[in-house]
Amino acid sequence: MSLISRLKAVVAGDEYLDDDFDELDYATEDELNDINDFKQTQRNSNALANSNPFDFMNNNRSSKVVGMPGISNSSSEVSLMEPRSFDEMPQAIQALRERKTVILNLTMMDPDQAQRAVDFIAGGTYAIDGHQERVGESIFLFAPSCVNVTSSSPEEASPSSVSPKNTPQYSVENNTAPEPAWGNSKLSAFS
């Protein structure tokens, strides 16, 4: 049927689509029963295959084993990378995405490329809510969010120990309290 003849049939109100429908085949009750029996057989065979042969010993007792917090069944993996160019950085990001800790030794790279690499990995680490830590000169630790990173010296980990290069540094030698605002503390109003 062409487009023009269909349009004419629609305007005239003819039953123009009767020829295009196929009869739907509905499953009979016997076929539905056969399908359900097959599914039940599959479930039973899967349950038997997955069952533990030692389950008969544990039927009468309840398990009192409690997992320790912070310890997972999967082993943690650390990836040590010593890249020579920036082209190797996507491998470090992939390792972080696979929930592996990455130690990046950038001593073999040009300083400009190393800075670019650290910025790239730091961005990827931030995107997955991970942690980053400078371990040594040109050595960095990047960890996914599932790994807690702690520092043995609190001074290194504190954000106050890191300051911009152009900011003047102030040190306070005297730890005594400042003088009160009303004047000399040695003088009293009643003397």
Curated annotation (Swiss-Prot):
Pfam families, A to Z: SepF (PF04472)
InterPro entries in the cross-refs: Cell_div_SepF, Cell_div_SepF/SepF-rel, SepF-like_sf
Its job: Cell division protein that is part of the divisome complex and is recruited early to the Z-ring. Probably stimulates Z-ring formation, perhaps through the cross-linking of FtsZ protofilaments. Its function overlaps with FtsA.
HAMAP family noted in UniProt: SepF (MF_01197)
GO BP annotation list: division septum assembly; FtsZ-dependent cytokinesis
Keyword Cytoplasm among UniProt keywords: yes
Protein name from the UniProt record: Cell division protein SepF
Gene, per the UniProt record: sepF
Keywords recorded for this protein, A-Z: Cell cycle, Cell division, Cytoplasm, Septation
Domain of life: Bacteria
